[in-house]
């Protein structure tokens, strides 16, 4: 594993290790996959404005999210069905997160039970949820999360219906039975045609859930609530007005509405309307420590990593996940040093130049 030096190399190992159906499930996006690809490419169009002759002999990457300290502004995004990638599933991912002193957001669609994940190691964890048509099931899950020591709820708001993921349709992707819902309802779908995941989502997800229903979620938990799936200033303002405790700028990894903007391109408009009242996080397309720096320079408090975690898990289990996080942290630390930023607070908007700024400078 010492020979692996970047996320792309882990992706290739994951492709070799996983059955095609599972690799396509994790790696694919919606329809033309424009948004999926643009998430990554948009970071590459942002350039640095490094400052020199700054004392960077000591670099401090640490920060806090909702008051919880983490070693670097790199968290684990919610992704489902980790046992499709590795037999230990989310418990391996959780142990790696704990070892790296970061926060894991556990998916509602996890293979392991929330209690198994919580008992696997001592760490800060948030729980991502969808709201099902049967609200009682969502309420039960939230109460279980509270009892298991989860510290926040992350409400995904961009899935009234599942995006059209053509690889899953072609592969007849199964929807496995999830242990968290045994005795409540069946999550298993093995389709004769089409995507089982899409069939399950159509049956289970509540497409009527709206901003006014945030009050319902608040009524059943005292945990902080973050909303994941914000892409516009209008919805960012609605989130603040609804009293949520944080925003995650996300397009669901390019898996929902194709031709949605890359998350890094809309981060600033969200940050500007939020005005520091609540934390703003970002996911989508982060593959390098340089990407982490760019997101922070444009106003994010931290980034979430999704697919790279799965690549590490599929390739090398817990150790693979740790390696992915450690690589990104190392790259981020070097970027801070070379940009003249000894601490997170030293990273400013003046350290980057976006594509629009470059184009305007040419006029």
Swiss-Prot record:
The Enzyme Commission number assigned here is 1.1.3.15
Instruction: Tell me any Pfam family this protein matches.
Output: FMN_dh
Q: Which PROSITE patterns does the annotation name?
A: FMN_HYDROXY_ACID_DH_1, FMN_HYDROXY_ACID_DH_2
| Gene expressing this chain | GLO3
> Which residues are responsible for catalysis?
252 (proton acceptor)
Cofactor dependence is on: FMN
An MF annotation (GO) of this entry: FMN binding
Reaction(s) this enzyme catalyzes, per UniProt: a (2S)-2-hydroxycarboxylate + O2 = a 2-oxocarboxylate + H2O2; 2-hydroxy-4-methylpentanoate + O2 = 4-methyl-2-oxopentanoate + H2O2; 2-hydroxyhexanoate + O2 = 2-oxohexanoate + H2O2; 2-hydroxyoctanoate + O2 = 2-oxooctanoate + H2O2
Record GO biological process? defense response to bacterium; hydrogen peroxide biosynthetic process
The organism is Arabidopsis thaliana
Q: What is this protein called?
A: Peroxisomal (S)-2-hydroxyacid oxidase GLO3
**Positions bound to a 2-oxocarboxylate:** 130, 165, 255
Subunit description: Homotetramer.
Q: Give the location of motif Microbody targeting signal in residue numbers.
A: 361-363
**Per the database record, which ranges form the FMN hydroxy acid dehydrogenase domain?**
1-357
Instruction: Give the subcellular location.
Output: Peroxisome
Tell me the protein family, please: Belongs to the FMN-dependent alpha-hydroxy acid dehydrogenase family.
User: Is the keyword NADP in the record?
Assistant: no
Q: Report the main location listed first in the record.
A: other
EC class name: oxidoreductase
Output the SUPFAM superfamilies linked to this UniProt entry: FMN-linked oxidoreductases
Keyword hit for Oxidoreductase: yes
Provide GO CC annotations from the record: peroxisome
């Amino acid at each position: 594993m010492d020979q692996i030096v970047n996320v792309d190399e882990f992706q290739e190992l994951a492709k070799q290790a996983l059955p095609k159906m599972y690799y396509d499930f994790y790696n694919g996006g919606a329809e033309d996959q424009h948004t999926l690809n643009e998430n990554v490419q948009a970071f590459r169009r942002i350039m640095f404005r490094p400052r020199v002759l700054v004392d960077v002999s000591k670099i401090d990457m640490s920060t806090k999210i909702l008051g919880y300290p983490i070693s670097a502004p790199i968290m684990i995004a919610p992704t489902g069905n980790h046992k499709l990638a590795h037999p230990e599933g989310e418990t391996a991912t959780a142990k790696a997160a704990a070892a790296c002193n970061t926060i894991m957001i556990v998916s509602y669609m996890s293979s392991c039970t929330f209690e198994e994940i919580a008992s696997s190691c001592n760490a800060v964890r948030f729980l991502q949820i969808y709201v099902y048509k049967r609200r009682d099931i969502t309420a039960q899950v939230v109460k279980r999360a509270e009892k298991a020591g989860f510290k926040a709820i992350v409400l995904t708001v961009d899935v009234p219906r599942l995006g059209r993921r053509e690889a899953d349709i072609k592969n007849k992707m199964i929807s496995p039975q999830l242990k968290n819902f045994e005795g409540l309802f069946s999550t298993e779908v093995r389709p004769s045609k089409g995507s089982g995941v899409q069939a399950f989502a159509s049956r289970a997800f509540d497409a009527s859930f709206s901003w006014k229903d945030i009050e319902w979620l608040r009524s059943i938990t005292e945990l902080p609530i973050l909303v994941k799936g914000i892409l516009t200033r209008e919805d960012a303002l609605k989130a603040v007005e609804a009293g949520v405790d944080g925003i995650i700028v996300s397009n669901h990894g390019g898996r929902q509405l194709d031709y949605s903007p890359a998350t890094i391109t809309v981060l600033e408009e969200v940050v500007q309307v939020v005005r520091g009242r609540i934390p703003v996080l970002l996911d989508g397309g982060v593959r390098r420590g340089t990407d982490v720096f760019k997101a922070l320079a444009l106003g994010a408090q931290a980034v979430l990593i999704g697919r790279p975690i799965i690549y590490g898990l599929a390739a090398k289990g817990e150790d693979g996940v740790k390696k992915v996080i450690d690589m990104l942290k190392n790259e981020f630390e070097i970027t801070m040093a070379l940009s003249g930023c000894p601490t997170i607070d030293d990273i400013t908007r003046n350290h980057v130049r976006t594509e629009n700024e470059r184009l305007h400078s040419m006029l």
